[in-house]
């Protein structure tokens, strides 16, 4: 969350990219720099570290410990999707694969046009390679889909199953391990009002040609091997 730590993370990732490039030339194999999901180890490692090193810093001090995955922001950092994107856009393009920005929403967007507008703004103004729109929803055995996190069905009062994305896929929150469950409780979601705030995002919108055509994105050097140049 701090500028110094973001710069340190950039230096570390660039160093790892350079080392991987050296290894590819040395061994003739291909290597990836990935932000692995760590849906189990982010809790397991934190739990064991707390036993052996009680003073170690983890997420959610004083309760169920867990680690924030890879170079993601702390889950409770902000409710402003563009503030989060500004930080992650410095880091996620440095991975060569296996990275994603999850746009966690408290509930689904009002319609497909709102979703399309958000997707377009991210695509046109940021370089990160992958991102998702990840609303939370609930399922009632009798009434089916319910928008947002609703522990009890508003129609019949029956207990529901709350679903959210755990790393790359949706699962019932009740089946998550203790660390991921704590992460879900700590998570700030990006509110619809902030996502739809045109004034907030206005200065991020680049000018786009109205004519139909193709856009080719290139990099100065090959991200996987410095021996190959465009």
Per-region residue spans from a language model:
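Long, C-terminal-biased catalytic regions of enzyme "large/alpha" subunits
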Residues: 1-202
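Local sequence-structure signature of Cys/Sec-based thiol-disulfide redox active-site neighborhoods
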Residues: 205-229
């Amino acid at each position: 969350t701090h500028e110094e730590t973001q710069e340190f993370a950039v230096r570390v990732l660039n160093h790892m990219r350079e080392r991987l490039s050296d290894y590819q030339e040395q061994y003739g194999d291909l290597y990836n720099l990935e932000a692995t999901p760590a849906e189990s180890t982010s809790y397991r490692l934190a739990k064991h570290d707390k036993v052996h090193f009680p003073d170690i810093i983890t997420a959610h001090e004083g309760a169920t410990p867990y680690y924030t995955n890879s170079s993601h922001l702390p889950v409770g950092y902000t409710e402003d999707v563009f503030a989060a994107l500004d930080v992650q856009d410095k880091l996620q393009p440095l991975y060569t694969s296996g990275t994603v920005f999850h746009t966690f929403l408290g509930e689904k967007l009002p319609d497909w046009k709102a979703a399309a507008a958000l997707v377009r703004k991210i695509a046109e103004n940021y370089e990160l390679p992958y991102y998702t729109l990840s609303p939370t929803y609930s399922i009632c055995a009798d009434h089916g889909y319910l928008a947002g996190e609703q522990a009890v069905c508003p129609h019949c009062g029956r207990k529901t199953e709350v679903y959210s994305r755990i790393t790359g896929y949706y699962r019932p929150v009740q089946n998550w391990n203790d660390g991921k469950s704590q992460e879900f409780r700590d998570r700030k979601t990006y509110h619809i009002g902030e996502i739809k705030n045109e004034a907030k995002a206005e200065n991020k919108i680049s000018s786009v040609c109205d004519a139909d055509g193709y856009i080719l994105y290139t990099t100065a050097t090959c991200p996987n091997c410095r021996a190959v140049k465009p």
